[in-house]
A protein has these predicted regions:
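Nucleotide phosphate-binding/pyrophosphate-handling subdomain across enzymes
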Residues: 38, 134-137, 145-158, 162-166, ...
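Beta-strand->loop->alpha-helix junctions that form or flank phosphate-binding loops
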Residues: 71, 194-195, 207-229, 246-250, ...
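N-terminal leader/targeting and accessory segments in enzymes
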Residues: 1-48, 52-67, 76-77, 190-199, ...
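C-terminal helical cap/extension that packs against the catalytic core
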Residues: 194-207, 211-216, 230-234, 299-302, ...
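Hydrophobic alpha-helical packing residues
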Residues: 57-62, 127, 266, 346, ...
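Active-site-proximal loop/hinge segments that shape catalytic or ion-binding/gating pockets
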Residues: 408
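Acidic, Mg2+-coordinating active-site environments of NTP-dependent enzymes
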Residues: 110, 118, 131-138, 154-242, ...
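ATP-dependent carboxylate-amine ligase catalytic core
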Residues: 18, 22, 26-37, 63-152, ...
């Protein structure tokens, strides 16, 4: 199979969407001899910040000398980004060979796997065959019934910031969502939690007690900023002083605190991670599309924020780094998101909106989004293509101005490709 054939098979239209449950992926991995059982893991869930936290953890573990796998979703530029070892995406020929091996197994299953389950099986098989020392594994959605939860008890089960998202599947209260996400906590693991409301923390604590798993909550009182510019951040966390990190925004400092708390937990469990690895790993963390400056004159920032909590963080970052500047907002969103509350956060900072349709079946049409955004009294232009939207954004933004591209991770790769062509 060629790479195009492999990707067409993975994304083929007759795969079902998200179907919670572990039976299908467990069956598929069983046909392969359960490779996932031969690897150590850090399992990360949460509503926001889980990808950034995964990237920090993987970078630190790699700097400590461990052969480190990283499994995340979605991708921004190429599908292969979703599974990496020591920062390198899965090679095309390896991906093709694995799909050729898994395809007949998946096709003959009476209850075939979903796309996410198939991709997860590919990643877990690759990590095991490459003899990774440890894999940082991001949950796709939820936790307890997510395909990634087929893995054995992880070294650490990490819960980042929890909020309302995917409510039709996970529940319509933060406590209900937390209960689902806490399903990744198993006996013989150590849980790490982003500080949250007492009612939410108690939900996680109940799960920990049932599993006999210790719980450590990150200490944001021990976190302080030293220097913060568009070039990066310097901060302190507990005994760590003057740590450097390229990821921007106060929310990333909080994600870093969760990552550092997890590193301390791993040390307690026998992993050798010295301070120099922590410093090097954080400084080298790369995670595109999170308040990422990709061009100057004008300043163009990419942010994959796709729910109200994300937009609170994005708005705070704009106020911090670009105080008083009028901002051109190029945006597109998925129709099932709470985009009203999202744009309530962003509208006061926008000089104008340019709407596009992300390349995703769940996307809201650019014209519909434009009609909605006109309620904020700002100029709004709907564009037929992302490339047209990028051209309009550049035309409408002065050289000393700023444009922010946001609303969906599914938008950003096409924005970058368009920027390279205009």
């Amino acid at each position: 199979m060629t790479l195009d054939e492999v990707l067409a098979y993975i994304h083929k239209v007759d795969w079902r969407g998200s179907v919670p449950g572990l039976s299908r992926i467990d069956t598929l991995l069983g046909l392969l001899g359960h490779p996932e059982r031969h690897v150590k893991y850090v399992h990360v869930t949460g509503t926001n910040g889980k990808g950034s936290t995964c990237a920090m953890l993987a970078s630190v573990l790699r700097a400590a000398g461990y052969k480190t796998g990283l499994y995340t979703s979605p991708y921004i530029f190429r599908f292969n980004e979703r599974m990496q070892i020591n920062g390198a995406p899965i090679p095309d020929d390896t991906l093709c060979a694995l799909v050729e091996e898994l395809r007949p197994l998946a096709d003959r299953m009476a209850d075939p796997p979903t796309e996410f389950e198939l991709v997860t099986a590919i990643g877990l098989t690759w990590f095991a065959r490459e003899a990774c020392d440890i894999v940082v594994c991001e949950v796709g959605m939820g936790g307890e019934f997510d395909a990634t939860n087929v893995i054995p008890a992880p070294e650490a089960a990490v819960l980042t910031n929890i909020g309302l998202d995917h409510t039709k599947v996970l529940g319509n209260t933060v406590e209900a969502i937390a209960a689902t996400k806490a399903g990744i906590i198993k006996p013989d693991c150590h849980a790490v939690l982003y500080p949250c409301a007492p009612s939410v923390q108690e939900v996680v604590a109940v799960r920990c007690r049932a599993a006999g798993a210790p719980l450590t909550v990150a200490d944001f009182d021990a976190l302080s900023s030293v220097c913060d510019t568009l070039e990066g951040q310097i901060f302190n966390y507990g005994p760590y002083k003057d740590l450097r990190m390229p990821l921007l925004g106060g929310h990333q400092l909080r994600n870093a605190a969760v990552a550092l708390t997890t590193i301390d937990v791993l040390r307690q469990r026998g992993w050798h991670i010295d301070e120099s690895a922590v410093r090097q790993g954080l400084a080298q963390t790369a995670w595109p599309g999170r308040f990422q400056v990709v061009r100057r004159q004008p300043t163009i920032i990419l942010d994959g924020g796709h729910n109200p909590q994300c937009m609170v963080s994005l708005a705070a970052a704009i106020r911090e780094y670009l105080p008083g500047q009028p901002v051109t907002v190029l945006t597109g969103v998925l129709a099932d998101k709470d985009y009203g509350k999202m744009y309530d956060q962003l509208a006061p900072l926008a000089a104008r909106f340019i709407t596009v349709t992300p390349h995703n079946p769940r996307a809201l049409d650019a014209g519909e989004l434009a009609a909605f955004l006109r309620r904020y009294g700002k100029p709004v232009t709907a564009c037929d293509t992302i490339r047209e939207g990028v051209s309009r954004m550049l035309a409408d933004t002065p050289p000393d101005g700023t444009a922010v591209c946001c609303g969906s991770l599914y938008l950003l790769g096409n924005v970058v490709q368009s920027l390279e062509k205009v």
